[in-house]
Amino acid sequence: MAISKKILPLLSIATIFLLLLNKAHSLGSLSFGYNNFEQGDERNLILQGDATFSASKGIQLTKVDDNGTPAKSTVGRVLHSTQVRLWEKSTNRLTNFQAQFSFVINSPIDNGADGIAFFIAAPDSEIPKNSAGGTLGLSDPSTAQNPSANQVLAVEFDTFYAQDSNGWDPNYQHIGFDVDPIKSAATTKWERRNGQTLNVLVSYDANSKNLQVTASYPDGQSYQVSYNVDLRDYLPEWGRVGFSAASGQQYQSHGLQSWSFTSTLLYTSPHYLKLGRFMI
């Protein structure tokens, strides 16, 4: 059947529109998953500091010896090599994202420290100086409480709780949101269980600007905390996602076992797309 010459331009416009829409979606989204880390996965990961990758053991963020005994004064991070679009300057829109991961903490002492954090930072983020210990590899202690000195948002799982020693920690083990400075904006009590896997879901809703964390152990014990935050106030337009962990004089190992992440930038309103003299 012949196609009318009047219909062809409309088909061309529709095709171009779909291609542009698909491109916009691909530029504004990121998705990856590691249910179990396998050989070759490290090609898409950036390891920093003392972090090591093993196909059989996952990612060990802080230093351990050949017997698995954790070291003192150690810090390590892992980031995904692909950048994520956090918001769009031209339209001022935000991204939705969801991260799922599991980790295990082990310590030969009762008061092991310091903790692990899921974080989002600028693409060129490196481990700050002197950040082993309580700042969890996220900031230099001298600028830890200076919002303008850091561009990072983190969900921390902090096992250190001697408040009088650093001035920012609550006096209990906790899950907390670190919005730029290291002091948590919102926290909930959390129990570190030596050698047990903690499964975590972190989600961000761009419409409500709500960041929520749900964590649980295999026996069903769960924890939840949420906080409203506008990513545009703290983070650049593009960033990287990853994990950071550290120990000071009190020590423990921090093993990342699985990690998946998805993000989608909310679609730009159709009137922003112009095709020739047509406004879609």
Swiss-Prot record:
Chain sites annotated for binding Mn(2+): 156, 158, 169, 174
MF (Gene Ontology): cytokinin binding; D-mannose binding; metal ion binding
Signal peptide: 1-26
The record's account of how the chain is modified after translation: Glycosylated.
Entry binding sites for a carbohydrate: 114, 134, 165-166, 248, 250
Positions annotated to bind Ca(2+): 158, 160, 166, 169
Keywords, in A-Z order: Calcium, Hemagglutinin, Lectin, Manganese, Mannose-binding, Metal-binding, Signal
Keyword Metal-binding: yes
A Pfam family assignment: Lectin_legB
Gene Ontology annotations of biological process type: cell-cell adhesion; negative regulation of cytokinin-activated signaling pathway
More details: The hemagglutination activity of native and recombinant SL-I was not inhibited by cellobiose even at 120 mM, however alpha-methylmannoside and 2-alpha-mannose inhibited hemagglutination at 0.38 mM and 0.39 mM respectively.
Subunit composition and interactions: Homodimer.
Record protein name field: Alpha-methyl-mannoside-specific lectin
Organism: Arachis hypogaea
